[in-house]
Amino acid sequence: MDKKASRIRRATRARRKIAELGATRLVVHRTPRHVYAQVIAANGSEVIAAASTVEKAIREQVKYTGNIDAAKAVGKAVAERALEKGVTVVAFDRSGFQYHGRVAALADSAREAGLKF
């Protein structure tokens, strides 16, 4: 099993558990160059809020889009957008990525901005 298949297996297992809870989830995806975050409704069919380093507003705030500072900016932005829509409690879906570095930084900044998980 290669690295990507292992990550997808971990992500699938976590998503199944979150689906059983029936919770709105904060999904994180990272690539070497960008960080993406979405708040997805409990039914899985609606994206309530989203933010990424691809967006011009966030890209202008940071020096480089693939580092911890960029992840913090994305976490803050997605949390503010979710709170505007009335979402305060989410389950954190790290998409099989290790809770470390950019993933942890995004989670911490989303918590500081007001999301609870």
Curated annotation (Swiss-Prot):
Belongs to the universal ribosomal protein uL18 family. This is one of the proteins that bind and probably mediate the attachment of the 5S RNA into the large ribosomal subunit, where it forms part of the central protuberance. GO terms for biological process: translation. Coiled coil: none annotated. GO terms for cellular component: cytosolic large ribosomal subunit. NCBIfam families: L18_bact. It comes from the Bacteria. One of its GO terms (molecular function) is structural constituent of ribosome. The gene is rplR. This is Large ribosomal subunit protein uL18. CDD domains: Ribosomal_L18_L5e (cd00432). Keywords: Ribonucleoprotein, Ribosomal protein, RNA-binding, rRNA-binding. SUPFAM superfamilies: Translational machinery components (SSF53137). The keyword rRNA-binding applies. Part of the 50S ribosomal subunit; part of the 5S rRNA/L5/L18/L25 subcomplex. Contacts the 5S and 23S rRNAs. InterPro entries: Ribosomal_uL18_bac-type, Ribosomal_uL18_bac/euk.
